[in-house]
Design a protein with these regions (language model features):
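Gly-rich Lys/Arg/Thr-decorated short loops/hinges at beta-loop-alpha junctions or inter-strand turns
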Residues: 20-34, 155
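Acidic/polar active-site rim loop that often engages polyanionic ligands
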Residues: 25-31, 56-57, 111-112
Length: 181
């Protein structure tokens, strides 16, 4: 997380991208933001994936989704059928599969050597939220100032996902979930 998108899209000259991998595996077990984003914006995400493929000059992309999200797998597979070179890859639920190196291994069976960059495997990995943000930036001329986030936990009466502006105080989101006891 927090690795600049433009750096991943411009790998060092010694490396050549062979595919894009979209990380649709929530990095923590209680998160559901990516799941909700896929259910609500599958078409836009596919357009974003296509744009990412063009940016790194590849004709193959994989979207890794854990198999405990069958509705997202079904929808994303249906939508991907309309796009050349995009394949949804159902993955076994295995923490921490959302890590970039683990995801590369799970999707294309290549390991990132110790001290090496993920691009050394030929894969450029981006998050499903990034694919959606790329769609919005390129197709809608909308800068990234908000994102879907999950606010959850046993102390909340109504755990929820929110489309929140970057910088929204956590107290405001917690209060929207019924507050803390």
């Amino acid at each position: 997380a927090c690795f600049p998108t433009q750096v991943k899209l411009c790998p060092p000259p010694a490396f050549k991208a062979e595919c894009v991998i979209i990380n649709a595996v929530e990095c923590e077990p209680y998160l559901t933001a990516d799941h909700q984003l896929m259910l609500e914006h599958a078409e836009e995400i596919m357009v974003g994936v296509s744009i990412l493929m063009k940016a790194v000059k590849v004709n193959k992309a994989f979207i890794g989704i854990e198999n405990n999200k069958p509705d997202a797998i079904q929808l994303m597979t249906k939508v991907a059928a309309g796009y050349a070179g995009i394949e949804v890859v159902p993955l076994k639920v295995q923490y921490p599969q959302g890590g970039e190196k683990q995801l590369i291994d799970a999707v294309i069976s290549r390991q990132v050597a110790a001290g090496a960059l993920p691009i050394s495997t030929g894969a450029v990995v981006q998050n499903v939220g990034t694919a959606f943000a790329v769609y919005q930036a390129v197709q809608k001329n909308k800068p990234l100032f908000e994102r879907v986030i999950t606010v959850t936990g046993k102390s909340l009466s109504k755990p929820s996902n929110f489309l929140a502006r970057i910088g929204t105080p956590m107290k405001q989101l917690i209060d929207a979930c019924g507050g803390l006891p």
